Amino acid sequence: EAEFTRFVRQIADQAQPLLAELCDNRGLTVTMGSIACAPAADWLAQLGAGGLHGFYSLGQDKRGALVSTSVGELVAQFERILGGTGEVDEDCHTLPSSAACFARQFEAKVASLLQRASDRREFAVSATGEHAHEIMPFAGNDKVWTVVLTATPKGATSGWSIRFALCQATLNDLVGARAVSPATGRSIGARGLDGSAIGHVELPLRAVLVDVPMAISRIA
């Protein structure tokens, strides 16, 4: 759970600027909901109808992230961009052709979001659809880690829920491949010590005297 929490926090941090740009709303905020672990079948039941789902693979068919959002909420964001109030019919379960381009832009932002949060460029959308069970490669009894992020544009009365689900194998892959950047030595350069960034930093200095008996004949 700790590893997934860390990953989700990175997603939330990266989501704000990306979604703010997508929605043309600098005041947009992103909040992270509670984290849960449940069988994939239970998660699918919670998604309900009228969703837009995308599976973002991690270079392998069964490893990746399932990202879901409501068609109605997606259309509401698009309507706000056009200057509307963001109010849509409750039975808006099918993506209108006018919002198809916006949906593709959303998918591109999610792919970028996953890449940045995981530092894995392999993340890419491999399947999309209105029915999650048709594109999700997890078995119904597979455990998945889930979280809901809520994006709320400035001035909006309601938020936009974006749901993430990852299987344990995907999480293990992300954790196992996490690269630890080695320390990189940098030379001071032609400016010398006084002209370097540490030239005027006071550093503690300690000298240790060591008694080393040595014959005078050995000293040149």
Regions flagged by a language model, labelled:
Residues 1-220:
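N-terminal auxiliary interaction/assembly segments of multi-subunit proteins
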